[in-house]
Amino acid sequence: MAVRGFKPTSPARRQMTVSTFEEITTDVPEKSLLVSLNNKAGRNNNGKITVRHRGGGNRNKYRLIDFKRNKDGVPAKVTTIEYDPNRSAYIALVVYADGEKRYIIAPTKLSVGDTVVSGPDADIKIGNALPIKNIPVGTVIHNVELAAGKGAQLVRAAGSSAQLMAKEGNYAQLRLPSGEMRYVRIECRATIGTVSNLTHDIVNIGKAGRKRHMGIRPTVRGSVMNPNDHPHGGGEGKSPVGRPGPVTPWGKPALGYKTRKNKKYSDKLIVKRRNDK
């Protein structure tokens, strides 16, 4: 996987880079695994904006991804590696021996023609999914479940991977991409390997228009708003905040203020926070 630049025909074009998509084998998705995806533009069921800076963008179909990998013991052959507009990782279309088709998150070095399988007896091979208790310590994994049978929730982004550090009783200790060390039940499943599209993080968007295609709208500074729109707004010219520190549009402290709940269930499962030295 690589990125490429462009001739500097404009200031934005000078900086812009794109993926070369060398691993992609087709641009025609499997029709039976597509569903409509309505653009909510950051609104909830009452029509109120709950997430700012969302709206517009390209209209996409959602690809149904198999995060559970619960079809045990049935080998599946990789037929295509595809681009998914709804996530940073690539996806792979696999066809099981009984004819069923599913999409999975494509790991790095998974190729068309490879065979993947899931279940407790699966080999330690890239793309295979099995319970953590059956995975050797030190193995690099992704698509990690937080609750057995619920489906993968951790380590799904492009280029990410976790490492199995230890097993202690009913729990396994993982080192996550953020550096956080946490416990996960050993019955939870994970997939062997690293998520595909390793160079995703070095792509330079280059211009605002590409962000608009992604459905992301501009972010306006509070200091240039009116005082009825933002606590930083108002005043003549470039005015200071006028408070002890910067705040959000709703008056809560911004920049470094901890928003995590004090008594969250997972506190006892986190051995080391991502920002601990």
UniProtKB/Swiss-Prot annotation:
Keywords: Ribonucleoprotein, Ribosomal protein, RNA-binding, rRNA-binding. InterPro entries: NA-bd_OB-fold (IPR012340), Rib_uL2_dom2 (IPR014722), Ribosomal_uL2 (IPR002171), Ribosomal_uL2_bac/org-type (IPR005880), Ribosomal_uL2_C (IPR022669), Ribosomal_uL2_CS (IPR022671), Ribosomal_uL2_dom3 (IPR014726), Ribosomal_uL2_RNA-bd_dom (IPR022666). Residues 264-277 have a biased composition (Basic and acidic residues). GO terms for biological process: cytoplasmic translation. GO terms for molecular function: rRNA binding; structural constituent of ribosome; transferase activity. SUPFAM superfamilies: Nucleic acid-binding proteins, Translation proteins SH3-like domain. Residues 215-277 are annotated as: Disordered. It comes from the Bacteria. One of its GO terms (cellular component) is large ribosomal subunit. Pfam families: Ribosomal_L2 (PF00181), Ribosomal_L2_C (PF03947). Belongs to the universal ribosomal protein uL2 family. Part of the 50S ribosomal subunit. Forms a bridge to the 30S subunit in the 70S ribosome. One of the primary rRNA binding proteins. Required for association of the 30S and 50S subunits to form the 70S ribosome, for tRNA binding and peptide bond formation. It has been suggested to have peptidyltransferase activity; this is somewhat controversial. Makes several contacts with the 16S rRNA in the 70S ribosome. This is Large ribosomal subunit protein uL2.
